[in-house]
Amino acid sequence: MEKLGLNELRERFLKFFESKGHLRLPSFSLIPQNDPSLLLINSGMAPLKPYFTGQEEPPRRRVTTCQKCIRTPDIENVGKTARHGTFFEMLGNFSFGDYFKNEAIPWAWEFFTEDLKIPVERLWVSIYEDDDEAFEIWNKKVGLPPERIVRMGKDNNFWEHGTGPCGPCSEIYFDRGEDKGCGKPDCKVGCDCDRFIEVWNLVFTQFNKEEDGSYSRLKNPNIDTGMGLERLACVMQDVNNLFEVDTIRRVLDYICKITGVEYGSSEKTDVSIRVITDHIRSTTMMISDGVIPSNEGRGYVLRRLLRRAARHGKLLGMDRPFLSDVASVVIKESKGAYPELAERAENIKKVIRIEEEKFEETIDQGLVILSKYIEETRKKGEKVISGDVVFELHGTYGFPVDLTREIAEENGLGVDEEGFREKMKEHQNLAREDYQSKQGSAWGDDIYSKLDKSVKTEFLGYTESEATARVLYIIKEDQVVDEAQKGDSVTVILDRTPFYAESGGQVGDKGLIEAEGARVKVLDCKKTNDGKYLHIGEIEEGTLRNGMEVKATIDKKRRMAIARNHTTTHLLHKALRNVLGSHVNQAGSLVEPDRLRFDFTHFSAMTPEEIKSVEDQVNEKILESIAVDIREMSIDEARKMGATALFGEKYGDVVRVVKIGDYSIELCGGTHLNVTSQAGFIKIVSESGVASGVRRIEALTGEAALKHFDEEEKLLRDIAQVLKTNPSDSVKRIESLLNEIKAAQKEIEQLRSKLVSSSLDDVLAKAVEINGVKVVTARFDQFDMEALRNTGDTIRNKLGSGVVVLGTGFGGKVSLVVMATKDVVAKGIHAGNIIKEAAKVAGGGGGGRPDMAQAGGKDVSKIDEALKQAVKVIESQLAG
């Protein structure tokens, strides 16, 4: 049996099925699209669900993929065993109503025995116990003897997911040899020992499970297969676990090299090495696909993995951030299959480095705190660390709960996870793995899923702004109706339309649908996965009936404004990459008629110079009046041209390419200008952060940009008028006024100091003594809070030992300050507690340290009373 590397195996599989008429699709993003049931893609078929359900039309009836997958339910076992991992690649060949068992089974056998040359005698199969059809194909067509075909029950060999498409499956097993088994004479497929390893699962989706639990046959059965690439590599390389597979082993070896720890020297260090190896593979792929560390959802999964890996690095003696270096090895090993890794390498490593540095700031302190709580828990004779402690470690020190659990288990303790979850709920910040149960299923129904799936709306909007059409459906109050009257809110589905439906960040068109005796004001347009355009609006006149001939007309002026912003968004994306670097990728966008919003990956606020450079570059391209060339082509042809694809977007065999000269080329389904000069110009109005590693630009074009400049110009004129100068001299006038103010403030401060100096002796002379402690109270209404604090410092220093209580009503606001020398703090004085009670009298609040505190209040007339209350509290503290 030929020893093949993981990368070669992947390519051999995909090429084999291409030879069988399959379209090779690139791996979909790990971020699910329109599937609230999943946090991250966890199987080869997950991103293909819409094709299996008929919600979307597949690019071809036969498809093959190698899909990146993440699974984290068993994260605590990763590292402890050599089998568990969070990242894996799933090979698959799929048929959407095309071929079935007669082809799928022999092809699987052909790939194994002829392409990979796996010895026939090492292969076994299992089938569903009632699937005689599969048995006949394996036995008669393939030639496998009956004793090597094992019938198994529903739990093992029948795939179903609640209600919906389901069916039997057949699994192919590799016999690792008797020496890996249990030694029992009846050992075969299904035995719990390590001899037989399941390599390939062929799912025959031929039934539909109904609500009542019955099964009906699907008109067009499907094929869904899945084979773990790493597991296949274990077989072909004759190794015992995924960490010994060639590409993964090279990552592991690099970790050993930089830590100076030999793999296999101890089980404890082996666990840490395996944790880092697995987690860096997962995190590198997640960041490449646009996941950013956060405290919720998939961002929290990423943070957990990175921080767990960082902690295990410390256990190996790493005292510096190192994970981004290891990520470079992952990128090197996988960039052939996933070229985007190389393109985004800088971005990936920067995300990892920043997150590791953040954790580095708190982990040591957190470990000290956790050690203290572990010791306290043991002293109490308890076995569980409280949920409050787990929450404190999570919120203050950035410890994911599974990291706290892992450390607790190493010390023979458990954690109160239920208590932790309750605390998280209180703070509305629960990041959960059971996202699926909270968000519902991607297989769920709505009114539109019950409509005829073969009915689609023909989109004419790329070339037409109005069109005649026929009403196919009218939906009112979530019900399909035959007609609707004036005043009704409706959704209208037409057989053809010029209305663009919201997608790709571009908002839907507005306009009118008119017929004889009826008019609908369209306020928005969306579309279903199966291609129906939903014209959402209100009937302004008459009665709209199903089957009516209508005229659909978009708001052309609004559409043009949207096109300005959409084309400019493409220019902006390219300019950002030119100015900031190739790590910049689109993380989201909103294209409206009056503005554009663009989110992108970058790790610091842009400087004013960078913003100006981007803006200038976009305006330069607008002024060049570059033709916007839009055409359809194959996805392969588009990639060869260098077209930029967006994170997580699904693309079919044929794609729409928007090319702006030699400057920008992107895959895009939106509406655009004919030439860039139609945009007028761009004005960036804001740049801000929206998440860790994600920045946002908001900008205006065309009329909106002109309006913005008009408003700015008016503001400048108004300022100049107030300053009694010309607009061009406003800055000089403001600088002059600021200098005058600064000089005046300096003079005031000098006068204030003289005033304080002259009155200090009087203030100190009025000091009272309480239980041997000097207490000074005074009121300075001419001082603001800053001056009051400075005066308090001066009096405390002159006093030498004692308490100072000052108040002011400057500007109509109450300000109070309490200061104490260290020796009286030792006697029981606490400035924070004193001021808290004093401020209540004046209708305010505050607090602070034992030696210094300040507060505010609302009632200036109560200042003297507040000072007296402070003295009472001091008496109480000294008496206690």
From Swiss-Prot:
Keywords: Aminoacyl-tRNA synthetase, ATP-binding, Cytoplasm, Ligase, Metal-binding, Nucleotide-binding, Protein biosynthesis, RNA-binding, tRNA-binding, Zinc. CDD domains: AlaRS_core (cd00673). PROSITE patterns: AA_TRNA_LIGASE_II_ALA. Binds 1 zinc ion per subunit. It catalyses: tRNA(Ala) + L-alanine + ATP = L-alanyl-tRNA(Ala) + AMP + diphosphate. It holds the Pfam family tRNA_SAD. Zn(2+) binds at residues 566, 570, 668, 672. InterPro entries: aa-tRNA-synth_II/BPL/LPL, Ala-tRNA-lgiase_IIc, Ala-tRNA-ligase_IIc_anticod-bd, Ala-tRNA-synth_IIc_core, Ala-tRNA-synth_IIc_N, Ala-tRNA_ligase, Ala_tRNA_ligase_euk/bac, DHHA1_dom. GO terms for molecular function: alanine-tRNA ligase activity; aminoacyl-tRNA deacylase activity; ATP binding; catalytic activity, acting on a protein; transferase activity; tRNA binding; zinc ion binding. Its cofactor is Zn(2+). Its EC number is 6.1.1.7. GO terms for cellular component: cytosol. One of its GO terms (biological process) is alanyl-tRNA aminoacylation. It is found in: Cytoplasm. SMART domains: tRNA_SAD. Consists of three domains; the N-terminal catalytic domain, the editing domain and the C-terminal C-Ala domain. The editing domain removes incorrectly charged amino acids, while the C-Ala domain, along with tRNA(Ala), serves as a bridge to cooperatively bring together the editing and aminoacylation centers thus stimulating deacylation of misacylated tRNAs. Belongs to the class-II aminoacyl-tRNA synthetase family. Catalyzes the attachment of alanine to tRNA(Ala) in a two-step reaction: alanine is first activated by ATP to form Ala-AMP and then transferred to the acceptor end of tRNA(Ala). Also edits incorrectly charged Ser-tRNA(Ala) and Gly-tRNA(Ala) via its editing domain. This is Alanine--tRNA ligase.
